Structure formats: C-alpha cells, structure tokens
C-alpha cells in the first residue's frame, strides 16, 4: 500500500507541472454572461431569484464510467480498494445493488448512449456498436457521420491520422442531460466527454455538447472534430505536444500488489489456458506485461489494453478541468469520463484473470486521484459524482465449460448457412438451377438477421412468414435459445413478465434493427476472435454498479431495482432541469433528500 501511495503522489506532483505548463486559461472571462445595467426593478428581482436557484445547483456533474466493470468486482476486490476511491463513493454516496441494463445488446455504444439520454436503444437509436444500414447497404459505426459517404467528409478530424475519419453524435436520436442543461443555460454550461474510444466520449456528451475528445491510435494524440469547433483548443494542442502516449506505452505492467497470493485467491492462476487464444503466446498472457509501438498505421493500439491509457485519460481530464474552468461558476458543467482500457483487458483475459483484477485495483486508485483533484479545485460538496459501467462481461466460454457450465462459441458461418438452407428449402424453385433465394438475406450482424425487403417483394414473400422460417432454423443450431421477429416486436407482442423479451424489445429500433433477433443460451456467444465478450441479456452482462454521490442524496445502500437509464432523469430532477427528450428511466426518489436543487 505504501508503494501505491507514493506512486499516486509522484503522479500528482509530476502532472501538476504539466498543468502549469498548459496554463490556466482565463475561461471565466471567456464565458458568455448577461451583462449591463439593470433598469427595471421587476427584472432585477427575477434575476436575483434566478441567481438564487442556480446557486443551489451543483457546479459540476462528473460521470465516471469504467468500461466492462461488472457489479461483482465491487465484492470480489472491494477490500483491496483504497479509502479515497470507490470505498469513498460507497461510503458517501447512494449505491444501488440491483442496477441492471434493461436492453439487449449490452455493448459499449448502447450503454454509453443510455447513461445520459435516460432511455434504451429503441428510443435513442444506438442499437449496437455498429449495424447494417439498409440505406447505405453496408455496416456503419454508431458515431460515423450519417452523411459521410464520400471522400469529402462533412467534418474534419483534428490531430488524427491521415486515414482516420471524423466521428460525430448525429446518429443519436434523443437529447442527453447535457443537451438539456445547455439549452437551460443558453449555452453557458459546458458539457465535455472524454475517453479512449470515440463512442464513449461522444455519446454521453450528446449532440449539443461543448466538446468530445478521444485517443488516436495513429498519432498518440487526444483528438476531436470540427463538429464541435473550428480548431482544436490551444490547451489540447499543448497537451499533445507533451507526447504523454510515448511515455505511457513504454511503461511495463507488473502486478500492483506485491503478493501474488491475493491474485490467486480472487482470480485463480495466471495465464490460464483459456486466455491463450488465437496467436497469443505464453508471454502475452503472463505477468509482467510490456508494450511497444506497432509498425503499422495504428502505432499506439497496444496502449489501448494497458492500464496506463487510463493514466493518460486522467491527466487529460485534469487538464480539461483546469483549462476549461469547469465548475467555477453557478452554471453547472458536465464532464463525462470513460475508462476504456478495462474493456480491452477484459476482452483479452476474461473477468476471472489476474489482469482484470489488477486493472480494477489500479482504476480505483485513479478514481481516488481524480476525486482528490476535483475536491481541491471545485469541492466535492459542489459536485455530483456518478460511477457506473456500460455493461458487464461473460466468462471466457472455455473457462465456463471447464467449470461444467454450458460455455461454447457458435459459428456465425454455420448459423447463417442453416438459415439460408431453410429458406432455400421453403422458397426455392426446384425446376430452376439458379438459387432464387440467394439474395434474401443481406446480413447477419450482432445476432440480427436482415432480409432484402426488395427481393421479398419481388418474389411476393411474406416477411412475417420468412421471419419464422429463419428463426426456427436458427433454433436448430446448438446454443441458440430464442428468437424474436420484427413483426412481433413492432406489435410489442411479448409476455409482460418476461425480462429477456423486455430487454430485446428495448433494444429494438424499427429503423435500425434487423428482422429477426437471436438470443443465445447463457455462457454461449456467437463466434468472436477474442477470448471474452458481452452483449447478452443475462446478469453477467447487465448487472453493473450505480453510485451517485453529492448534495441532495442520502448516502446508503439501496436494494430497489434500478437501471443506468435512471441516472439522467434523477440528475435532471436534482438539478431542476428538463429530463432528456426520450427519457424512460425513473427518478431514484428513494435516495433523494430534497426534490430538486431549484
């Protein structure tokens, strides 16, 4: 523990010098404020009333997301957390023990979109990390610009690589808490999103955000786009000039704790056989780890799966707080920070690994450092802090199988062939040598089957019927548990007390989802090229921490059912602003001390 504390102090001291070199940009003078003499007494009274209302609001909302942080990590590793990190939030905040995502798929983009829109993919439009776009006739990313289909993109990427494209929030179809707050304050509130992943920075911040910043694996810079401003702020340019990515990618990754026994106790053996996946070597899956730059365009990709990319984010976040003047006046600002490295590590090693345990302990210490920094700059008494995750993760299937659980991988190609064979059998013309059904299926993406609707109309095929043909065929493939059809979901024809069906319905968007949605059996998932993944409607993927700390909430442990979709409406209630446009979450009233900060 002594070594850990010294490391944290050293990091804080070294970074203080970096902050000073960046300057403390006189942001308060730059903020737009109503000014000039007041000549109408009634107007003066109204302004004083408004000042009183805003003075009671938190000056900063800080949303901390740890990508792929399952709820049980709090229990498995909690006694090893330090006092100022997650232990502090559990002690001083309101914590919900039964917070589950109420949608499927449980991926990064839908999770991050849910957090600040207060609603599900069916309403906010972010149905997956990527999906088949019928209009574009290709797979599109959740933050690729909808109109970026040419070599002349609508927006420019600042400080990125030559082949990297600008990302935007324009596929998000609902407002966020930040959007509503900026409308309430006429743009005076600042809303900034930060992450390694573009989607994790962009989606929680919203469409009317001040800025979103993410990490370029091509340049090692923190980047953004002309969607937000005409040029990158000077302080960001200065931060990038410090080349912190070069420093962190050179850092070896040893275990944080000196005692390997603690890791064996909580995570089993190191370098378990199920971690050796694909081309991984024994050295790749064993502590200590080392990183080096790629010799390809994505030079800094190895840093993604290093815990030190979280340190890079921490430094950048502290620089943003200082240089943007966040939390320095009565207009509430929002800062969202998503630690992505935990997800990369979890995918490569699984949730029951030394690496996942180690990065979880390191993240706890990074959160403690951030809370201390915010306390010194703004005051935690003036801050609403939220801690959660975007999803959980399943055990590595081979690990589950070794424990006599039904773990396996389902071949996408075999699944697709079974579906096509059933369609040929039902609709093929026996007197023709050509397969007339060959163009009926456009894509199998994220367990969604997309049909060629034009081809079905051409051959007068009933969509409702072919949905059932394809779904029944999928059920014959080992590992597929259930299916739901577009026809069924558009009618909301699901059992009211079926939580799996409800999560599928909440994840279904009629414009973006497929025509048949498949659900795998627990501990089984569709073929992937990494050891562990997520996306199911089962508890290991849906159950996440939900902690809110700050004025207006009674600290304690709450056992009521909750969902991360409840975060945005609860914060809106506390701040006294309009809830996001499509908000479907509930206000977590059981923890509220006062109705709102009005």
Segments from the language model and where they lie:
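Long, low-complexity, polar/charged, intrinsically disordered or flexibly structured peripheral segments
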Residues: 244-322, 326
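A long, amphipathic alpha-helix that forms part
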Residues: 47, 54-56, 81, 303-329, ...
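Secreted, luminal/periplasmic, and some membrane-associated catalytic domains
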Residues: 66, 98, 107, 129-166, ...
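Short, structured active-site-proximal loop/turn typified by the sulfatase FGly-forming signature C/S-X-P-X-R
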Residues: 74-124, 190-194
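Active-site-proximal N-terminal segment of extracellular/periplasmic enzymes that hydrolyze or transfer
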Residues: 36-94
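Bacterial N-terminal signal peptides
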Residues: 11-23
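Active-site regions of oxyanion-processing enzymes, predominantly non-cytosolic
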Residues: 188-195, 201-202, 264-268, 310-343, ...
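Active-site His/acidic residue clusters
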Residues: 202-211, 289-305, 328-363, 399-401
């Amino acid at each position: 523990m002594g070594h850990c504390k010294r490391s944290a102090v050293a990091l804080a001291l070294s970074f203080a010098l970096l902050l000073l070199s960046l300057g403390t940009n006189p942001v308060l003078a730059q903020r737009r404020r109503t000014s000039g003499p007041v000549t109408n007494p009634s107007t003066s009274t109204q302004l004083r009333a408004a000042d009183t209302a805003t003075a009671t609001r938190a000056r900063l909302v800080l949303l901390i997301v740890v990508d792929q942080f399952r709820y049980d990590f709090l229990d498995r590793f909690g006694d090893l957390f330090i006092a100022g990190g997650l232990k502090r939030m559990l002690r001083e905040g309101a914590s919900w023990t039964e917070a589950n995502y109420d949608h499927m798929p449980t991926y990064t983009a839908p999770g991050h979109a849910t957090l600040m829109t207060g609603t599900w993919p069916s309403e906010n439009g972010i149905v997956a990390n990527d999906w088949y776009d019928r209009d574009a006739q290709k797979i599109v990313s959740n933050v690729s610009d909808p109109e970026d289909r040419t070599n002349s993109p609508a927006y420019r990427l600042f400080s990125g690589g030559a082949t990297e494209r600008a990302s935007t929030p324009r596929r998000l179809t609902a407002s966020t808490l930040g959007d509503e707050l900026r409308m309430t304050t006429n743009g005076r509130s600042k809303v900034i999103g930060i992450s390694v992943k573009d989607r994790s920075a962009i989606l929680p911040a919203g469409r009317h955000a001040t800025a979103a910043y993410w990490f370029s694996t091509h340049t090692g810079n923190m980047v953004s786009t002309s969607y937000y401003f005409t040029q990158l702020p000077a302080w960001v340019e200065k931060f990038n000039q410090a080349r912190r990515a070069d420093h962190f990618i050179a850092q070896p990754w040893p275990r944080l704790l000196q005692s390997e026994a603690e890791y064996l106790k909580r995570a089993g053996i190191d370098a378990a056989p199920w971690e050796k996946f694909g081309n991984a070597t024994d050295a790749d899956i064993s502590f200590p780890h080392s990183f080096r730059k790629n010799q390809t365009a994505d030079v800094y990709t190895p840093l993604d799966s290093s815990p030190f990319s979280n340190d890079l984010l921490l430094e950048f976040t502290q620089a943003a707080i200082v240089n943007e003047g966040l939390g320095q006046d009565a207009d509430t600002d929002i800062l969202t920070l998503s630690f992505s490295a935990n997800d990369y590590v979890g995918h490569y090693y699984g949730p029951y690994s030394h690496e996942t345990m180690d990065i979880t302990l390191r993240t706890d210490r990074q959160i403690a450092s951030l809370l201390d920094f915010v306390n010194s700059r703004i005051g935690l008494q003036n801050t609403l802090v939220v801690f959660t995750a975007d999803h959980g993760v399943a055990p590595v299937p081979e690990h589950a199988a070794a424990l006599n659980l039904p773990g396996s991988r389902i071949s996408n190609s075999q699944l697709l062939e079974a579906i096509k064979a059933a369609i040929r059998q039902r609709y093929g013309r026996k007197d023709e040598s050509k397969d007339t059904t060959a163009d009926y299926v456009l894509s199998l993406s994220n367990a969604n089957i997309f049909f060629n609707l034009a081809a079905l109309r051409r051959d007068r095929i009933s969509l409702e019927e072919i949905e059932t043909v394809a779904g029944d065929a999928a059920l014959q493939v080992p590992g597929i548990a259930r299916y739901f059809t577009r026809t069924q979901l558009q009618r909301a024809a699901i059992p009211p007390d079926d939580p799996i069906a409800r999560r599928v319905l909440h994840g279904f968007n009629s414009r973006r989802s497929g025509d048949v949605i498949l659900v795998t059996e627990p501990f089984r998932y569709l073929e992937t090229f990494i050891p562990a993944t997520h996306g199911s409607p089962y508890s290991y993927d849906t159950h996440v921490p939900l902690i809110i700390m700050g004025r207006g909430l009674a600290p304690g442990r709450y056992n009521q059912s909750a969902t991360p979709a409840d975060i945005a409406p609860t914060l809106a209630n506390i701040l006294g602003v309009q809830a996001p446009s499509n908000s479907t979450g509930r206000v977590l009233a059981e923890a509220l001390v006062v109705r709102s900060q009005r």
